[in-house]
Amino acid sequence: MSKLILAINAGSSSLKFQLIRMPEEELVTKGLIERIGLKDSIFTIEVNGEKVKTVQDIKDHVEAVDIMLDAFKAHNIINDINDIDGTGHRVVHGGEKFPESVAITDEVEKEIEELSELAPLHNPANLMGIRAFRKLLPNIPHVAIFDTAFHQTMPEKAYLYSLPYHYYKDYGIRKYGFHGTSHKFVSQRAAEMLDKPVEDLRIISCHIGNGASIAAIDGGKSIDTSMGFTPLAGVTMGTRSGNIDPALIPFIMEKTGKTAEQVLEILNKESGLLGLSGTSSDLRDLSEEAESGKARSQMALDVFASKIHKYIGSYAARMHGVDVIVFTAGIGENSVEIRAKVLEGLEFMGVYWDPKKNENLLRGKEGFINYPHSPVKVVVIPTDEESMIARDVMTFGGLK
């Protein structure tokens, strides 16, 4: 029998939701509540393909969930709140405590709160959503799905930093990795498209959006990933620097008189494509500017692609080869130019890709861009983290 599952992504003043019919993975409705706790909160819900928007004051997440459930009934999406069978909550950081998704109990809630020091901007906000749903829908399973969980299969040699070992033991300082739900979804989907068990494949997954991370997935398990202790590490991103020499932080502080917090803010919000180009963090703007002859915008795009290119070579070495390269997320799914730059010169690894196929895969289209004879397959897959969340609610919420 079909189940109705809510996939939830709660921010400090927002709540993103999708109602999904399982196991069909059919989207019933989706929407967004913005400006929670502020004046003129905005509630948007999709009804029969049309967006319905209302503006009203919503004081907290409990009221936001209440309004959402009322809207479901008002638009005949459900007859009764008991029609909802389970909820799945995106939680950014599960640390080492949570190697997989978990049914939420009071104890789990407490542990997520304790992990907030590892994700101070996200975990407390994710908890607001969890608490609101547990309060208003107390009789159904609620499941936490962690961005970090998929990467908990990394071996020590991949996740340890070359620091005094007691820093890891005392403070949990290590690589955690993020975007795990997306990497897991696309690796499973790539295996389906190839009609091979994921256990038999070596996959390099490139989740490239405003935030970007690359993952080495060997036999269905993450064995390395580009993000680190925080999502600041790895490749160049929209506004994040990615990897830099750590000695630059005190150097910048000395030269500019800025505090460590201010430098960290610059690395997170003023660097990456924005910092390099000086104009925008949006790849579409930079592509237009580069076409019109802006050298700095072109340079920013070149740096961005070269960092991803380098990780592909590195992860192919880590897995002693590669069978599939996956592109996903906003840029990975839509930027013909970045895919081409990233794949350039990889023929020595057995990557032969078709420029025509590359040009045709845009706006949510899924498919292969390699030539049929290419030993390494290259595939574009629109990510669907919400379906992955719903699958985990079915599994870990005991609904199968």
UniProtKB/Swiss-Prot annotation:
InterPro entries, A to Z: Ac/propionate_kinase, Aliphatic_acid_kin_short-chain, Aliphatic_acid_kinase_CS, ATPase_NBD
Subcellular localization, as worded in the UniProt entry: Cytoplasm
Active-site residues per Swiss-Prot or TrEMBL entry: 147
Residues that hold ATP according to the record: 16, 207-211, 282-284, 330-334
Metabolic or biological pathway: Metabolic intermediate biosynthesis; acetyl-CoA biosynthesis; acetyl-CoA from acetate: step 1/2
GO cellular component terms attached to this protein's record: cytoplasm
EC category: transferase
Subunit structure: Homodimer.
HAMAP family: Acetate_kinase
Family to which this protein belongs: Belongs to the acetokinase family.
Name of the molecule in the record: Acetate kinase
Name of the gene encoding the protein in the UniProt record: ackA
